[in-house]
């Protein structure tokens, strides 16, 4: 059972739904939800925002607000010794400023504890999102081993697990964190190792900076393994570059460019190594006319353009980093490689084995799903474990279904060729693939990093209900359409969601986004609440 304490302006009492319990208390100033583990606020919604001190800067008002809540945060001393501003975002639509924060201990970031604060134009704080760790006592922040030693240990342990690694995909680094786990607090190096062979992965190792032992490890690769019925053969139109009578799959009209290359079935490990270290992208795809006869490359190029256009036209976003980053795609990576992934530098696509998968670049929603992982990386930075990881996957599914908006299925174009109507996941009916559609049926085990690909379907169902409406578990939801829904989720992702956002926090983030866009008390805000209630997220 999940226990949450919630302070509310409107009522006091005890209510239950699914397997969640909320305890409410009256307050005239703010609504607070407390994290069940630390009993510190996971979000604060200001009903009567504090009056800012005159002649102060925005950051001074921010830290004054944080100081005001130090008791609730269970922190000692000034807020500026516990929080670091990592990013500042100005929203021209509402004139609000959004601060992304990182909680620190003696200057060292606490892993997974990031926050977001929304401030009005008059410097009044409107809301606070993100879990806060209470005061940590007596942890040394002086490492006893070097970063190099930590990297060596991580690689040794990984090879013991998956076999000899000939090449790493890029140069590994070790970053110091305070790592909370099992009631302990360790100074640890987070070492990230990217591999394609002998097993694809984006491995995270937490190495104790005192004794060099492995505290924890997991694989956080974002990939779409298996979606759709293959490259469809439909005719596509897309932008290319012509030079001296030769045509290239290079589009310089969008951001800093969209380029598509051919790996010529180069081993995926070697390709990714060259990609990371020297920027190798494969061979240029050239045609003597404007007609290209490479179906996998045509789809990769056209779909990348479609996803760029979707984000640009729908949200005003300039590529995945909001700064026009070049989108590079390479097809024919490996031989019969059943995978597609964003590797931190570019998109890579395998051809599939012809049985379970066909060329994965043929699926628009897969391309959108993977590029959205990059958007999430550059905005919210959701952790890839438990409920934050499930939200990471769900948001990619939601945006995939919005970019390819003819249905609510994911990967139907390239998954299991020969099986009509099959898909990898369904937002409309997650049970088609045996996935849960209500929080009471969530997966609670440790596989799949706490069910990131399983429990994502619960949030997917909420998104479907928000857009289309319907009755689910006895709750009537009035649909608000795809257009309003996608705006709400994008705003929540880029302004309110933080690394540790869970399902309940995501609900409140979506409500705040709806309030920003359509006004408090709007039908859109009401539908958000009902959609989450219908799937048991309260």
From Swiss-Prot:
Positions that bind Ca(2+) 3: 415-416, 419, 422
Obligatory cofactor(s): Zn(2+)
Signal peptide: 1-28
Cell compartments where the protein resides: Secreted
UniProt-annotated binding residues for Ca(2+) 2: 404, 406-407, 412
EC top class, as a word: hydrolase
GO molecular function: metal ion binding; metalloendopeptidase activity
Residues annotated for Ca(2+) 1 binding in this entry: 365, 404, 407, 409, 412
Zinc listed as a keyword: yes
Keyword check for Metal-binding: yes
CDD domains linked to this entry: M4_TLP (cd09597)
Temperature dependence: Retains 65% activity after treatment at 65 degrees Celsius for 20 minutes.
PROSITE patterns reported for this sequence: ZINC_PROTEASE
Chain segments carrying region Disordered: 421-441
Catalytic residues in the record: 370, 453 (proton donor)
Alphabetical GO biological process terms: proteolysis
Summary of activators and inhibitors of this protein: Protease activity can be inhibited in vitro by either a zinc specific chelator, 1,10-phenanthroline, or a metal chelator, EDTA. The enzyme is resistant to phenylmethylsulfonyl fluoride and iodoacetic acid.
Keywords: Calcium, Hydrolase, Metal-binding, Metalloprotease, Protease, Secreted, Signal, Zinc, Zymogen
pH dependence: Optimum pH is 6.6.
Enzyme Commission (EC) number: 3.4.24.-
Propeptide: 29-223
Function: Protease able to cleave casein in vitro.
Protein name (record): Neutral protease B
